[in-house]
Each structure stands twice: as structure tokens, then as C-alpha cells.
Amino acid sequence: MRGMREVEVTPTAAGRFEAVIGGDRFTQFSLLADATHNRFLGRSIWNINAVGLGGVAEMLRGLVATGMGLGIDTRWLVIDGDAGFFAITNRIHNCVRGWPGDGGPLGDAERRHYESVVGANRERLHELVSPGDIVILHDPLTAGMVDMAKETGAPVVWCCHIGVDVANESTQLAWDFLSPYVAQVDAVVFSRAEHVPASLAGTRTVILPPPSTRSR
């Protein structure tokens, strides 16, 4: 495995949005952008996922580029994994969506392997992240990094971009696996309120629909 790496993103100039949203709204946008820039001055926002391609990666590329264009130190890190790790996380991914996938287990052996892969990123994460930064973890592949991210002194947000409106045995299996990792997160983000599991009912939750209709 190559370890955690940073994805290079070209900033998007904020001025390009004026033609899209119009002059008055762009003025409001600029004021909000300036306030946001000042709020995050001297801090970095670290987005972490496990793949550089696909739907979440497409979203991250746009968000990171926009943040950089606003003068906010916005970063994107990708962790690496072996075939066993991706087999386990693909199984979790399917179960969160209510489908058993390959029907394989999510037991102690799978948990040990999952933790060994995400745990290999602890030292590098601690080198990069400073207290006061913000760490945003994306999807089940990075859920196991919550504790090590909090060790840096940074607030940690976990975003789950998948889900299903009606829970079943498969979703229960997935959340039994994931809940111990995300229980201590500072906030969670879901696309729909129906996707929030009962195990996270007391956690600060933000509902943020996907920016693209293709992802809904």
C-alpha cells in the first residue's frame, strides 16, 4: 500500500460564479465568502476519503477547488487499502444501502483487518493536522479514523453519502459495525434524514442533499 496521499486540485476562481447567480446574489456570496475566509484564517480543512475516482471524488474536487478559490486552505487526502480492505468496505457500503451484497460477514476478523488498514494512517495524519483545523471524513471507508483524527485536537465531521429510507437486516449489520467508530464524532452529515440510524440519534446531525441531481 502507498499510504495516505494528497490529491492536487486547481483552485476555482470565485468570480466565475457571478455569471451563474447574478450580480446581487454574487455580492451576497462575496460578503459571505469574505467572512468565511476570515473565520478559517490560519486553519486548514482536511477532506479524507479512500478513492480518487467516483461520485464522492467528483464532489470533493469541486468543493476543494471552490474552497481554495476563496482563499481557504482546503485539502483532500486519499487513504490506501488492500484488496481485503476494499472487499470489507464494499460489503459495508452495500449493507448501508440495504443490500447484502456478497453476503459475507462483518465480524471480528473483518473489524481487525479494517482497523489495521485505517490505523496505518495515524502517524501521517498527526503530522499534517493541527489543533483548530477541521477534519471531514467521507463514507464508511474512513469511519475508523474518527478517534485518531480527534487525537490531533481538530473537530471531526463524518459524512455518509449513502443510505436507504427503510432500515432492514443489512443496514443493521452495517451500523453495528460502524457505530463504535463514529460515536465520538463532533457532527455527522447525511443526505436525507431517513438515512440517519438510531445509533446516531443523539449526535449533532446536518442534512445536506447532494449538490448534483445525478447523486440523489
How would you label these PLM feature ranges?
Residues 1-216:
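Catalytic cores of nucleotide-sugar-dependent glycosyltransferases that transfer UDP/GDP/TDP-activated
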